[in-house]
Amino acid sequence: MHGMVLDISKRKMSKSDGNSTTPAEVIERHGRDSLRYLLAKLSKGEDFAFDEKEMSDVSRIFMMVNNIDAFIRQLPTQDKKMKSFAAEDRWIISKYHKLIKEVTQAYNSYRFTEVINLFEQFLVFDLSRTYIQFIRERSNEVAPLLKEIQMGLLSFLAPITPFISEKFWQRLKLDGEVDESSVHLSTFPESNIKKRNENLEKSFETVI
């Protein structure tokens, strides 16, 4: 549940005041999933100010998801398992399994704002700006790991952005990467404590 949606001046939206925007109008301009994502990000069970300009931030996140998908799709698909793991691989695996645990806990407590914050932190900083930069010269080697993470991220997004998540899942289905006919029929990832390495996570903080 969320509180009252206010305008950018934190006043109650009202047609008579001319400061109201209907969900239908926002959806027509930006799409259903964009509105769902922004409301999940902003709503903490309290009143909040709605600024449509923040939709540009949502668009940037969706564009990053699209760019990562394009990067992963051009990688080879023949190897389903990695033969060896470098330090950066073990680091992203640890961060990913930490993310699974925290996102699961947040969903179970209906803390959707926290789900979005955790997702963005991992997507932007851990995956895009750090890990992918580390592995660009050996990206073919880590294709199975990247594809596993991508499937997990789509599962995380699916309850909030069902249409966009399904679009990317169907691309995976077309490429023969997944068996489930829909992301909404897939198994939610489970965190494995044996794949966590907190010391490695801390050591990477000093590097990045």
Predicted features by range, described:
Residues 1-2, 9-12, 23, 34-35, ...:
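Extended, hydrophobic alpha-helical segments in both membrane/secreted and soluble proteins
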Residues 2, 52-57, 119-121, 137-142, ...:
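Conserved short loop/turn motifs at secondary-structure junctions
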Residues 2-5, 186-187:
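Conserved beta-strand -> loop -> alpha-helix junction used to position metal-binding or nucleic-acid-contacting
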Residues 4-85, 174-179:
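Catalytic adenosine-cofactor/nucleotide-binding cores of aminoacyl-tRNA synthetases and other
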Residues 30, 38-42, 68-75, 119, ...:
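Generic structural signal for hydrophobic core residues of well-folded globular domains
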Residues 60-73, 87-99, 116-137:
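Core structural elements
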Residues 78-104, 132-208:
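Acidic, turn-prone loop/beta-hairpin segments
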Residues 107-114:
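Short helix-adjacent coil turns
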